[in-house]
């Protein structure tokens, strides 16, 4: 059975056909509409899936935000242009006439990355560092989503009580500091207004402020990982996302994690499926996982 998998992120929308063998084909992308109106997202999703839907028997959605009763509830609306709520399952069923499931994108990615691990691993945490910071937790070999869909939203744990206000309403969240949006928001002077990609480029060219911003992000993530180890005693942490997979970033996180007491050390791995983990995880879950 072929699944039409959709990944809804803060920067881009992606869709692909995924067969029972896990092979991805006909992958497509569109920018995420920067609009508070549900109609803008619906129109973008329609354009994305219309060339693919005739070749699929079901739809699986991996989306940023809390997924509850098939709807997207934005924990940080800034990541979706201010959109607060969107009926994901209902909308895609109307657009495609296919049975549809939905799950948080980081939770979906966690499940895909867990399947790629070698050895006897039952406890794993996945972290994505991208427009925002998200996560997924596998414990006892099972994906934890929680009764309200909140499990794994580790980007909204506290990093600095005196830090910037996060879009979720809290102050000093990991996401407000370590994410691509957080990196860009802290830039000053000649870097003011630059996006995270530009800041990484400037850091590679020796710009001291850019390097400081990236080190600040990596240090914040390392402290989060130490907290995660203390909370879950996970066997490994897998890191993905556009920032998490940027050249040199994971090595920085490892350097800062090594400065924590040994009890909080844990193996760090780069995401095996890289930017396709959300699509693959949603498709895998559609094959039999009850959400």
Curated annotation (Swiss-Prot):
EC number(s) per entry: 2.7.1.60
Ligand binding (ATP): 5-12, 132-139
Catalytic reactions on record: an N-acyl-D-mannosamine + ATP = an N-acyl-D-mannosamine 6-phosphate + ADP + H(+)
Family matches, as SUPFAM superfamilies: Actin-like ATPase domain (SSF53067)
Gene Ontology MF term list: ATP binding; N-acylmannosamine kinase activity; zinc ion binding
General function of this protein: Catalyzes the phosphorylation of N-acetylmannosamine (ManNAc) to ManNAc-6-P.
PANTHER family: N-ACETYLMANNOSAMINE KINASE, ROK (REPRESSOR, ORF, KINASE) FAMILY
HAMAP family in UniProt: ManNAc_kinase (MF_01234)
Subunit and interaction comment: Homodimer.
Name of the protein in its database record: N-acetylmannosamine kinase
Organism: Escherichia coli (strain SE11)
